[in-house]
Amino acid sequence: VNSTIRVAGVSAIEVTSLLSASGASVKGGLSLLSVPLKLNFQYVMDQLKSSSVSNEPKVSLDEDFELALTEGFSSTSNFTFDTSEMSLNATTPSGPLALSFTTGPSSLTTALSQSGFFIQSDNEQSKFNVNLPSNGWNFELDFQEFSTSLNMPLLAKSGEQEFGMSVNLSGLNLSDTLWNLFDSGNLMPDDPASMKFAIEGSTILDEGLTSEAIIENQNLDPLEFGQILRFELKEFLLNALGIRVEANGSFEFDNADFETFEGIPRPTGTASLRIKGSNAFIDRLENMQVLPSETIMGARMMLALIMRATGEDILLSEFEIDEKGKVYANGQRLR
């Protein structure tokens, strides 16, 4: 399938798309007459595959989104490709600009039903590059893996419903040009960085998340339309700049008590925190002179207050919130 869109006026736009059995591509250009700007872009996906399954009741999503879900609407779709490449070249008043983004095997899965909404994205072997020849800048970063997932309830129900979210980024590398912007003296280890976290929990929704009152009010407090029953930090990992931080925890909430912790239901549970390499990291920050000495000293004092040393530059802390709202760190009461 081949299609072309052209628009002319104060600006000229042309977009051409091609969809075939082996992949897909989109390319086009933009030229503004009022500003000396020209832009060309292209996005190509190889070995593109997609599939979808849906069940549609008599009431459509367009007619009544919430009622359609209640009546049994469901849809699942999957989208994969082996490689992709996006490139953008622009001529601006300040000089030329080039952007590129490439990925290896990638996939996107979505599902929608009365159970809620689910989305998962996975990308491997990705690389992002920005080139500004007029300034002599050529920035590049790449990562081995980047995946995210989210599942959330949508409809109001009397019983509890599950939610969850996860992010996994591994093998992140920065080019020397980009690294030198904040560490020109190479004081920090530049090993590949990684970050991972996963949360899950349960809630009771007194009002569906698809209601107009919620969608139109972006500043609405989530506790105004539901209750949080349980929250679990299943995993947290940050490994970068020579420091490794790991954490996990689990809490339950008493929605009849908003006074012990003003404005939120009273939590009860435990959490643990482990930090490796913090002293060496703070020493390097001090040598870089990016923070005032008072801030550095404050960070050391805070760590000494809530953490205990368990090995060579390893700190550990166990946190607890009891049923009376008392907060402890390693058995020492903080609140």
Pin down the residues of each PLM region.
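Glycine-rich, small/hydroxylated-residue low-complexity segments
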Residues: V1-R335
